């Protein structure tokens, strides 16, 4: 994937989490943020341009691991997300690619598609005529679930530890980003480009909660229509800023080579 997308992974609102060393106060929130294509070394590489908060705060006040690696070569979206969410390799958690060949049917399968769990509500599926992600177009059903994930995730383990008090959510622009991080015990919500709203499948919910309906009713995505993402400074002020627009780059429909 050439575009950088952010998956706000797991928001776990819980009490009584047991760690190796019990903190003075119980941990009530665990937030996992997974950024597509953001290698660990890039955090320091671009650190000179950081402002207050954000990555600067994480570097100054957090623990930064400079030599942490996972043993897989295929760096597609679902592979990395599932590896970070489970702590296991693709050969174990099963998410080996965005699309793989099903040995039983002999057909290509999209990683989180599941005909048994259709999308909740109408008009939220993938529109193949406008979808720019070729892997999404290969799905033979609009249904989605974490069934293909063979191991438990961080959220699953915390749910097992805490029980019904744990509130586990995965939120992402992409279905595969939200589902892998929400796991089997959480609830995944992702953005429907067709419907312009956050959606889920019947694996997770029988009806949308009021707070999701309220957010969708605000029409936040529509407020960004006909607007562009403008740089704060001149292009030459950025590292590699002058090389951003090249003739050999992919020209995404509706986006161009830069946006």
Ranges and model annotations:
Residues 27-39, 58, 84, 158:
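Beta-strand elements within well-structured catalytic alpha/beta cores of enzymes
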Residues 88-259:
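His/Asp/Glu-rich, glycine-adjacent segments
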Residues 43-92, 167-169:
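Short, structured active-site-proximal loop/turn typified by the sulfatase FGly-forming signature C/S-X-P-X-R
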Residues 39-45, 68-71, 139-146:
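Second-shell loop/turn segments in exported
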Residues 7-16:
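Bacterial N-terminal signal peptides
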Residues 40-43, 77, 178-182:
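Extracytoplasmic/secreted cell-surface and envelope-processing proteins
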Residues 1-4:
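Positively charged n-region of N-terminal signal peptides that target proteins for export
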Residues 18-22:
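Boundary at the C-terminal end of the N-terminal hydrophobic targeting segment
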